């Protein structure tokens, strides 16, 4: 885990090293100061030597300034290094997620990925900043202070060695009890993020059904679980400070007692025993040693908290994308023909491996228009998502242009397959910015032509700023039908060999739907078009109509053929046209 995280330090190695070097300088000055104080007392104050007092006072002042300077510079370098580390780590994680296939994202869930990119990375950033300072400062301080203390009086310094094991055992007990709690807390954070995202995404539904209290209870329940777990962890961590203080006061008390007796016994003569200045130095070193141990305990606390975050981040970084571009990949798509050969497919997460598509056999010639209908849960969307290789089949093969999609360069394949998903997504920015997702180099004329085909140009022209109208996040300031038409125009700008509309005209009226299909037939006759729809009118003029039921193609043919051979198709047709004869002939 540590090795993987260290890869994200990169250009921040220099700042990290400088932070550790300067903090070492701070430690040196801090260890020297008690020795200078001892000399000031023993050789200046006790002997009344004002010249020596002034000289040592200046040295002490310079040492304190040196300590202050090194500490401040170290803090600056540590802040830069930790911020850069967090930036690199977030970039590495985001880049990894961008290369995930849908199945990888299904495994983690969106809320969990967001938590890892935010909360977990922030925990690691704080821990890294503490490590490059405290993990250097505290051990050096403890070692240098111990050496200096033993140089003054080895017997009295044994007190420190007796106290350290007590601290180590106490810290081990605290850490082992709190780590499992923090693991549980971060899993609960994922649930909390999921509830918040779901609520904000569906806030209009929540308010229209007056379900604010219900959503509040859901949020409160999860938040309460986090509170209880954190309380348990903090109750364990609360023992850390009292344990440190107990050891520190015990050391000071023992040093004072035995040190005072030694001074009395030798008459304050450093040559035969211990001087007053040396005792004060020992007390200073006792404080420094125990404070350094307290710093180490804080590091262990942070490591306990961030260990779970580190494991979660590394899990995301180590995840291998299920779908990748193969070696010697095919770099061009010959045409828009599509073949399904004995295809079976199941989702790895959420369906327990149960196939959602079974034994699909189909040939679609280039330039054909294919309609797909079926009830809810008949796997219509799953069927078309295999064409641009958003998922891989379990058995069989899907071919585009006569070549297995698994042999294509992913960018090449998906560049020639435009898909308007069932859930239409627009991004914050102008209409023109959103449309250029289809082709970032598209001219204004090309953009307008695509919108005319998608029947979007008319309503865009009604906006005061036209194509420069700003779209709010998620497209909340345009209607559902307008959003669908903008997404269709965006797909058309790709100039694809295959165009897939996954129930993408459900929010437009039948007349506009017919105009869109008419424009397709006239303007892009050589593009293979797959139209998933709930309305028979949207597909009845297709060259081939597929009827899916429970993950299988139960019927296939033209509208007239299916009216004769498919009970399911005929039932849907009659239910939609009953009492509405115009709908039957909409075109």
Locations of regions flagged by a protein language model:
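Transmembrane helix-loop-helix hairpins at lipid-water interfaces of multipass membrane proteins
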Residues: 10, 16-73, 77, 150-155, ...
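Alpha-helical transmembrane segments of multi-pass membrane proteins
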Residues: 15-16, 63-82, 129, 133-140, ...
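Juxtamembrane helix-loop junctions of ABC transporter transmembrane domains
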Residues: 21-22, 29-42, 63-110, 114, ...
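An intracellular "coupling" helix at the cytosolic face of ABC transporter transmembrane type-1 domains
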Residues: 11-13, 99-103, 119-132, 136, ...
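Helix-loop-helix
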Residues: 49-58, 148-162, 171, 232-311, ...
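ABC-type nucleotide-binding domain
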Residues: 332-587
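Short intracellular "coupling" helices and adjacent cytoplasmic loop segments at the cytosolic face
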Residues: 47-48, 83, 91-115, 119-121, ...
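A short amphipathic helical element positioned immediately N-terminal to and/or at the very start
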Residues: 1-11, 113
């Amino acid at each position: 885990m540590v090795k993987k995280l260290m890869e994200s330090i990169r250009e921040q190695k220099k700042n990290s090293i400088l932070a550790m070097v300067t903090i070492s300088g701070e430690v040196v000055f801090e260890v020297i100061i008690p020795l200078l104080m001892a000399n000031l007392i023993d050789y200046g104050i006790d002997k009344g030597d004002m010249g020596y007092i002034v000289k040592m006072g200046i040295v002490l002042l310079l040492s304190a300034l040196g300590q202050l300077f090194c500490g401040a510079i170290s803090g600056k370098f540590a802040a830069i290094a930790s911020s850069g580390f967090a930036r690199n780590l977030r970039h590495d994680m985001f880049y990894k997620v961008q290369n995930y296939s849908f199945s990888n994202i299904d495994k983690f869930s969106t809320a969990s990925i967001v938590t890892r990119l935010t909360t977990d990375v922030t925990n690691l950033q704080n821990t890294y900043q503490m490590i490059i300072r405290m993990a250097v400062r505290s051990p050096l301080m403890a070692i240098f202070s111990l050496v200096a203390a033993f140089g003054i009086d080895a017997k009295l310094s044994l007190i420190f060695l007796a106290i350290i094991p007590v601290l180590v055992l106490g810290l081990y007990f605290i850490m082992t009890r709190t780590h499992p709690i923090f693991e549980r807390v971060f899993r609960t954070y994922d649930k909390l993020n999921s509830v918040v995202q779901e609520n904000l995404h569906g806030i209009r539904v929540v308010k229209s059904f007056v379900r604010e209290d219900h959503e509040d209870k859901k949020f409160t329940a999860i938040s309460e679980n986090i509170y209880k777990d954190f309380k348990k962890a903090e109750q364990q961590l609360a023992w850390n400070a009292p344990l440190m203080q107990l050891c520190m006061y015990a050391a000071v008390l023992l040093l004072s007692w035995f040190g005072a007796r030694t001074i009395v016994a030798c008459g304050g003569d450093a040559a035969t025993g211990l001087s007053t200045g040396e005792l004060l130095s020992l007390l200073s070193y006792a404080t420094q040693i125990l404070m350094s141990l307290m710093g180490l305990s804080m590091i262990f606390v942070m490591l306990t908290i961030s260990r779970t975050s580190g494991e979660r981040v590394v899990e995301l970084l180590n995840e291998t994308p299920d779908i990748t571009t193969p070696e010697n990949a095919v770099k061009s798509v010959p045409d828009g023909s599509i073949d399904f050969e004995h295809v079976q497919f199941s989702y790895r997460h959420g369906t327990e491996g149960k196939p959602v598509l079974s034994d699909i056999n189909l040939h679609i010639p280039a330039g054909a228009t294919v309609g797909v209908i079926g009830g809810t849960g008949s796997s219509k969307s799953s069927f078309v998502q295999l064409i641009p290789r958003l998922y891989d089949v379990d058995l069989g093969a899907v071919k585009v242009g006569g070549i297995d999609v698994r042999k294509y360069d992913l960018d090449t394949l998906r560049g020639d397959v435009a898909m308007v998903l069932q859930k239409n997504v627009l991004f914050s920015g102008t209409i023109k910015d959103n449309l250029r997702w289809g082709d970032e180099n598209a001219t204004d004329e090309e953009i307008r032509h695509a919108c005319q085909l998608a029947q979007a140009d008319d309503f865009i022209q009604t906006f005061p700023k036209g194509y420069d109208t700003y779209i709010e996040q998620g497209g909340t300031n345009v209607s559902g039908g307008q959003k669908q038409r903008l997404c269709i125009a965006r797909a058309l700008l790709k100039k694809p060999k295959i165009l897939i509309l996954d129930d993408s005209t459900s929010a437009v009226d039948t007349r506009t739907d017919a105009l869109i299909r008419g424009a397709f037939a006239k303007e892009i006759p050589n593009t293979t078009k797959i139209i998933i729809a709930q309305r028979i009118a949207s597909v009845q003029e297709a060259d081939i109509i597929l009827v899916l039921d429970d993950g299988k193609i139960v019927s296939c043919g033209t509208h007239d053929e299916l009216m004769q051979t498919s009970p399911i198709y005929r039932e849907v047709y009659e239910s939609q046209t009953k009492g509405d004869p115009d709908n039957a002939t909409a075109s």
